[in-house]
Amino acid sequence: MAVPTGSANLFLRPLILAVLSFLLLSSFVSSVEWLDIDSSDLKALQVIETELGVNSQRSSASDVNPCGRRGVFCERRHSATTGEYVLRVTRLVYRSRSLTGTISPVIGMLSELKELTLSNNQLVNAVPVDILSCKQLEVLDLRKNRFSGQIPGNFSSLSRLRILDLSSNKLSGNLNFLKNLRNLENLSVANNLFSGKIPEQIVSFHNLRFFDFSGNRYLEGPAPVMSSIKLQTSPHQTRHILAETPTSSPTNKPNNSTTSKAPKGAPKPGKLKKKKKKSKKKKVAAWILGFVVGAIGGTISGFVFSVLFKLIIQAIRGSEKPPGPSIFSPLIKKAEDLAFLENEEALASLEIIGRGGCGEVFKAELPGSNGKIIAVKKVIQPPKDADELTDEDSKFLNKKMRQIRSEINTVGHIRHRNLLPLLAHVSRPECHYLVYEYMEKGSLQDILTDVQAGNQELMWPARHKIALGIAAGLEYLHMDHNPRIIHRDLKPANVLLDDDMEARISDFGLAKAMPDAVTHITTSHVAGTVGYIAPEFYQTHKFTDKCDIYSFGVILGILVIGKLPSDEFFQHTDEMSLIKWMRNIITSENPSLAIDPKLMDQGFDEQMLLVLKIACYCTLDDPKQRPNSKDVRTMLSQIKH
């Protein structure tokens, strides 16, 4: 049956364009989903998931895009081989999946892997030595499984590890593999079969906020420094990629079996026969065209609907475009001055002046400010796995983000000569950028380290000035600001010094504003840093202003003694801690033994002993007996040179 040429051309042109558009769109989507994924990662992932037992839980439909699967997260990386960008597997999160397999040695092929979370399964056998090839690994969470055997001896080569949880398994051997993991923040090896002594090096891990060695009956001796800590980690939250929404493809099925009859008494066709045949052909062509166009239109509509549906879900789950920057200082004239924080290449070119649990601190020149230098602190805020988000979770996260912005807004408007001013805040889905004034002298911890190494001098008048400045800043936060702000992590690393050696307390208000950020607190909402935490916190888990006073007392002791709580010196004393050693020396026949030898015989011994007594007063075990920040500032101000 022929279709009239004119009509066919009229209808087929838009049809051909629609088909071509659909095919181009399909090929584009396919290239995004497949062509940019690193082939070696794909092969490794296939083996890893098979041996873990993940594949048995997955339908064939989920194999379309490995980076869109539940638990598999990828990031763009530049390939040195091809010179192009590829997707690399950076996180594998298979918690609570009832897995009963093993970790494949192929895990070592994932050279960009930053997180491996397999908690709460029934996985068995040993942790393969091949995991040592994952040099980028930062999070290893294997708790609540049935792993056995010993941890590989060269485990310390995973120097980037921040979170290590091996608890509730059947692992054995000694703990020497922990010796050089100096970037650890959260550590738990509880409820295993480990034996031997706990490595003394752990006390020098400055980033360590939390550790748990309990439940290992064969371990010998106490835990270093803070042997009473018995905390439990909570699941480490990770970044996510929203799962693909299935595309629907409705089709239309027109009824083309209709017939017509001539009215009774109507004339016979005669000369109208050819016209009727042409009319019939047009109707058939229209029916066929309608069927094809309807089918293709339905398919395209279904595809578009699925994309829109996905975008709506992302918006509901808090993945909407982040708000613009909050600016708190006239130094930053417009939001565009902070646009470089959205540029990965621009950030990569900045000088890194510090690294910690929260991420990195960059030194940058503020655009349009005639050379004004700023410090940009990146605070990691990993979002929850999209597959685990419920509607209630989404509402909670949205409320939480509003609360974070509100808290930071409060901090941004605080101004005091002994508090480091926050200039701006830029929020991103997975991190926060906090912009501060740049302090060229660095932190008190940096200076004390240089002094101890003999590279710098810090005489007593300068130390007293620093102590008085910290006390004044605390007094403002505790007594003068409404609402009261408790620092929660006061330590030398959070005290910066300006050009006049005036103390500036940093990071105040952040521990409350961002409790899930991996900054100065653990994921179980435990605040502070080992060596500076008030003893009552381990019983009450409540942080008060008297906890800040305790931390300040430790800093006063450091300024006089010249040693940090993590110094090996205290490990060779009977007291095993700075505070206990300080108390015993100050009540001994010769309290001057507590004074830093670099400060002796300069005529300030009496003043330093007075400050040491104030330090003991601030670190009393009973928080009710400790002074408040105003009393401390008053006592220090009465000590004259």
Curated annotation (Swiss-Prot):
Gene3D superfamilies membership: Phosphorylase Kinase, domain 1, Ribonuclease Inhibitor, Transferase(Phosphotransferase) domain 1
GO CC annotations, alphabetized: peroxisome; plasma membrane
Free-text tissue specificity from the UniProt record: Mostly present in leaves and flowers, with increasing expression in older flowers.
Signal sequence annotation: 1-31
Outcome of swapping G356R: In sobir1-7; suppresses BIR1 (bir1-1) disruption phenotype
Result after altering S329N: In sobir1-4; suppresses BIR1 (bir1-1) disruption phenotype
Catalytic activity, EC: 2.7.10.1, 2.7.11.1
Cytoplasmic domain ranges by topology: 306-641
Chain residue ranges for the region called Disordered: 243-278
PANTHER family: LEUCINE-RICH REPEAT RECEPTOR-LIKE SERINE_THREONINE_TYROSINE-PROTEIN KINASE SOBIR1, LRR RECEPTOR-LIKE SERINE/THREONINE-PROTEIN KINASE-RELATED
Name of this chain's protein: Leucine-rich repeat receptor-like serine/threonine/tyrosine-protein kinase SOBIR1
